[in-house]
Amino acid sequence: FIKLFSGLKENFGQIKLHAKVEFDKERNKIKPEYIWSKQPIQPTHYQQHLEGKISIGIQPCTKDGKASFGCIDVDPENYKDFNIVLLLSYIEKYKLPLVPCRSKSGGLHIYLFLTEAISAQTMRDALASILLPLELKRTTEIYPKQIELEPDEHGNMSGNFINLPYFNHTKTKRYALDKNNTALSLEQFIKIALASRVSPNELDQLITRVDTEILMGGDPEFEDGPPCLQRLSKTKIGDGRDRFMFNYMVFAKKKYKENWPDKVNEANKYFSVPWPL
C-alpha cells in the first residue's frame, strides 16, 4: 500500500474527521474539511489510515517533480445520477491498466500506477490522453495537479493531495471496484494494483495504441482536426449535438476559411436527428 501511494514525503494531507461536515444538496456530495499535516509522512500514518484513526492524502508530485502514481478524479455534476458502470465498461473496452476506487464523496478516483517514477508533467499528459477513451471532459481533475513544488514561507511543500482509498479498510466506503462493479478487499486491491503497474515505455505504447483505436474509423474530414470530432464522427450523434457543433464551427472556420458556413450546413450528416440551423 505504501509502495503504491508513494509521493511527496515531506508533507501529507488529512481530513479533519471530527469537524462539521457540509453536504452539497445540489450535487449530493459530502464536503469535509482538509488540512496539511506539515510533517513528513511515516509508515505509521499509512497504517493509521487503514485502521480508521486518521484519513490521509498524498501529493503524487515529489519535491523532485516526479510521480509514480496519478489519478483521474471523477467528480460528477450530480452524484445521485453518476453512472459508474459505464466508466468501468470503457476501462475494460480499451484494456486500460487503471484501478478505479470509490471516493470519499461518492465519485470515482481512477488510479494509474507505474513501476518507476516519471516526470509529473509526463504523468499529467498521459492521464489527459486517457480522458478521451473514458468519455470524460477535458476539465476533469487530474493528479498530480502540480509539476513542481515550491516551499511556502514556512518551508513546507504542499500543492494538492489526493485522499487515499481504504480508510478504515474493514468498513471502508472507499474501495476499489472490479470490472463488474464489485467491491474489492484491501488485499485484493493491492494485488491487482501491483499487477496493473506499467513501465514508462509501456505507458508510451499504451497512449499510442489507445489514440489509434479511438480515431480509427472516423470521418476523413477530421484527419487534421481535433480527436474529439474524429471520434464522434464514427457513429451518428444523438446527445451532445450543441457541443459538437460548437467545436465543428471552430474547426470549419480554420479549415475552410470563406466556405465554412456551407460546411456547417452540411454537418447535419453526423447527427441521428438534424440540428436546427
Located regions from the model:
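A residue-level signal for conserved active-site and pocket-lining positions in enzyme catalytic cores
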Residues: 1, 72, 164, 249, ...
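Short amphipathic beta-strand starts and helix->beta connectors
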Residues: 50-58, 90-98, 231-237
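Short beta-strand
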Residues: 58-62, 98-105, 141-145, 154
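Structured, beta-strand-rich domain cores
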Residues: 73-129
